[in-house]
Amino acid sequence: FGATLLRDASEEELRSKVYAVDTDPGYIRDTTAWPMGDLVPDTVDTGIDRTAINEIAGKLMDDTVYGGIPFAFVVLHKGIPVAEKYRPGLGKDTRFLSWSMAKSFTNAVAGVLIRMGNMDISEPAGVEEWKNDERSRITLNDLLQMQSGLEWNEDYGSRSDVNLMLFDKGDMSRFAVTKPLEHPAGTQWTYSSGTANILTSLIRNEFDSDTSCYAFVHDNLLEKIGITDAVFEVDPSGDLVGSSYLYATARDYARFGLLYLNDGVFGGERILPEGWVDYTRTPASASEGKYGALFWLNRSREYPSAPEDMYSCQGHDGQMIFILPSSDLVVVVLGFSHRPDNALDFDGLLRDILKTI
């Protein structure tokens, strides 16, 4: 499952790379209780109006009420799935492309490494190409908050940096690290998929092989939160494409949101460092309150009907994981929902969901 573009490597070279990562969870998901498995309780009263929330799910898939072209919808209240709806032909086992929601998973992988003492966000990133110039001052925190100061163009409608990186480069992080410094580190916020791929390259450098890196991500993050068959795609160089290319089910995206809702703890086990979620939700100083550490924030009230403490993973074309701590909610919406002529009304959807509590 998944694909890698043929760039700077032959098909024979890529097919010769075999990564032996054991992804067998050792249990059957359909007969294992939520959240580690897919056996969902239908009798737990969380205090939400289930009839109303499921009416909203039906209206969402109607297309004409909230707009957009949604593919999947999952709502957790107090950790329990209370609504789930899919477009015909899709279902709970369908894996959906994350696009930039993958950046938030990169945050989580970094968090696990930091909990284990392998990385320090206050330290310089240590990129070899930067060691003899001002870029040597860029810290992991600057990269996580997208305040590296590196020149970057994230315009998807042109031959931009992001399009060149994703579709024309065999080693995406190498392309990103060559960008010159445009602003002093920590002083300017610039949304950059290049930054996320620099981070995944630094993560890869913590291991002695590609296989060890992939196994670490699976064993210490994904499997720990019940995600057993997600695919984190790699570029031809072997680095995880931490900016854009993760495939997972809607339930798995909900599990990921639940990890953050529960302050980095899942099933009673601490996965992320204590204080990591608070750090993640702290606005980057130059972001005007809209961005934390590879998560979007609602401090600037982009979604006025939602509480200010809401934060989210967001991907191209409207892939969303909304996390609402004060309402004990996780809302997953996947699909094709950002067309200018038919954008999904996420604020209206959130408003109506909140009315059901």
Report each predicted region and the residues it spans.
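N-terminal leader/targeting segments and the immediately adjacent pre-domain N-terminus
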Residues: F1-G91, Q145, T356-I357
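Active-site SXXK
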Residues: G79, F96-D120, L143, L199-I203, ...
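Active-site helix/loop module of the DD-peptidase/beta-lactamase fold
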Residues: R115-E151, T178-P180, D208-S244
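Active-site Gly/Thr loop motif
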Residues: I227-V234, R281-V330
